[in-house]
Amino acid sequence: SFAGKYELQSQENFEAFMKAIGLPDELIQKGKDIKSVSEIQQNGKSFKVTVTTGSKVLENEFTLGEEAELETLTGEKVKSIVKQEGDNKLVVNLKGITSVTELSGDTLINTLQKGDDTYKRISKRI
């Protein structure tokens, strides 16, 4: 189960990736050192994911395999389908960005890819 709270431990390529997806420099500078906390609630195939970064809260609810409206890092709402691969991987495509969330023990690894740009977030269960 993905359920739990996870605190960001490290991230790779944050600034370059955020620039590539069009986030303004001011927001990139504000966000680069903030430790975000992700909370995942899971009930069978239904998920609620809340990511709190400072005062910004990003909340998405979805059911695996069904279309849902998801909010992206840039605040846009995009209709997409989250799929599960194996026991420990969630995959979704949001407007050209592929997001893979993988659970390995108490470590949650989220990799976002757009073209040649990749951004990786590593969080630990708290």
UniProtKB/Swiss-Prot annotation:
GO terms for cellular component: cytoplasm. Its main location: cytoplasm. It comes from the Eukaryota. Keywords: Cytoplasm, Lipid-binding, Transport. InterPro entries: Calycin, Fatty_acid-bd, ILBP. It is found in: Cytoplasm. GO terms for molecular function: lipid binding. Forms a beta-barrel structure that accommodates hydrophobic ligands in its interior. Binds free fatty acids and their coenzyme A derivatives, bilirubin, and some other small molecules in the cytoplasm. May be involved in intracellular lipid transport. The specificity of axolotl L-FABP differs from that of LB-FABP. Belongs to the calycin superfamily. Fatty-acid binding protein (FABP) family. This is Fatty acid-binding protein 1, liver. It comes from Ambystoma mexicanum.
